[in-house]
C-alpha cells in the first residue's frame, strides 16, 4: 500500500471501468485505499499529473483497458467514507452519489480507475 500522506501517488497498469479509460492529465481525482488490503476508503483527492495507457496484449480478444497514472495530492480526507458507509445504498436507480460509488466500487471489488458523475464529485468534495 501507499501511505495516504504522500504528496504523489503512482498507480501502474490499473484496470479501468465506467469510463475510467478517459482519464486525462489535469483531471480531478479521488483516491480510495482498498479496504480489502487494509485501507480505509476515501483518503485523498488530487490532480492527475501523468497518464500512460497500457498496450494491449497480442492475441487476447477481450481485455479490460488499463492505464498507469501519477497523481499529485491536493488534500487529505477529513471524514471517513468507505464500504461500511456505502453498503446500504443499493437501490441502483435512486440517483444518489453514495449508490453510484457503492455500485462502481463494491459490486466488483478490484482495484480500478472509474469515471464518476459531476454530482458524485461534488458529494466527495464534502469530505475534504
Describe each model-derived feature in a short phrase.
Residues 1-25, 36-37, 115-128:
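Compositionally biased, charged N-terminal/linker segments
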Amino acid at each position: 500500500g501507499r501511505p495516504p500522506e504522500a504528496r504523489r501517488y503512482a498507480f501502474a497498469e490499473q484496470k479501468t471501468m465506467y469510463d475510467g479509460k478517459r482519464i486525462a492529465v489535469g483531471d480531478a481525482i479521488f483516491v480510495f485505499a482498498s479496504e480489502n488490503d487494509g485501507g480505509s476508503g476515501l483518503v485523498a483527492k488530487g490532480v492527475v499529473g501523468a497518464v500512460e495507457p497500457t498496450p494491449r496484449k497480442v492475441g487476447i480478444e477481450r481485455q479490460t483497458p488499463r492505464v498507469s497514472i501519477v497523481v499529485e495530492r491536493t488534500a487529505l480526507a477529513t471524514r471517513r467514507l468507505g464500504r461500511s458507509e456505502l453498503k446500504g445504498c443499493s437501490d441502483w436507480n435512486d440517483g444518489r452519489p453514495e449508490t453510484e460509488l457503492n455500485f462502481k466500487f463494491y459490486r466488483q471489488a478490484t482495484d480500478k480507475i472509474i469515471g464518476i458523475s459531476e454530482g458524485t464529485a461534488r458529494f466527495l468534495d464534502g469530505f475534504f
